[in-house]
From Swiss-Prot:
Signal peptide start and end residues: none
This protein's record includes keyword Manganese: no
Pfam family, one: RBFA
Function in brief: One of several proteins that assist in the late maturation steps of the functional core of the 30S ribosomal subunit. Associates with free 30S ribosomal subunits (but not with 30S subunits that are part of 70S ribosomes or polysomes). Required for efficient processing of 16S rRNA. May interact with the 5'-terminal helix region of 16S rRNA.
PANTHER family to which the protein is assigned, alphabetical: RIBOSOME-BINDING FACTOR A, CHLOROPLASTIC-RELATED (PTHR33515:SF1)
SUPFAM superfamilies reported in the protein's UniProt record: Ribosome-binding factor A, RbfA
Subunit structure as annotated in this protein's UniProt entry: Monomer. Binds 30S ribosomal subunits, but not 50S ribosomal subunits or 70S ribosomes.
InterPro entries assigned: KH_dom-like_a/b, RbfA, RbfA_dom_sf, Ribosome-bd_factorA_CS
Protein name, entry field: Ribosome-binding factor A
Entry's Gene Ontology BP terms: maturation of SSU-rRNA
Length: 138
């Protein structure tokens, strides 16, 4: 079992190499249909399984097409990783779509909407009625 430091170093190396492959060596047109970037790599402690999280910018159709292209290129990516990274065993590669950027944008837009509603809402009266008034007795 590899140490935590080694796992994180190998994960960063895989992230860098897969990013380079996406830019230069994967020739599948489906992969180029959406703007794509590798956001993270989750590597198992025994260095046998790598989940590669990718963020795809584009329409839903482009995302689906890009994910299909990545899934078909999984064998090629694993083979290239074996040539570029010298490990005893090359990890199994699984591509996962990372939608955290979109979810973050949705949360920010909701927060801006709430802030805008609060600014446009008239301020409620925070003054308490005098002690001897009729409203205070109710």
């Amino acid at each position: 079992m590899a140490t935590g430091r080694r796992v994180s170093r190998v994960a960063e190396l895989i992230k860098r190499e897969v990013s380079q492959m996406l830019l230069h060596s994967i020739k599948d047109d489906r992969v180029g249909s959406g703007m794509i970037s590798v956001t993270a790599v989750d590597l198992s402690g025994d260095l046998q399984h790598a989940k590669i999280f990718v963020s795809i910018y584009g329409t839903d159709e482009a995302r689906a097409e890009t994910m299909a292209g990545l899934e078909s290129a999984t064998g090629y990516v694993r083979k290239q990783l074996g040539h570029r990274i010298h490990l005893r065993r090359t990890p199994e590669v699984i591509f996962c779509e990372d939608r955290s950027f979109e979810e973050g944008n949705q949360v920010l837009s909701l927060l801006h909407k709430l802030d805008h509603e609060r600014q446009n809402k008239p301020a409620a009266s925070t003054e308490k009625p005098p002690v001897g008034s009729l409203d205070a007795d109710l």
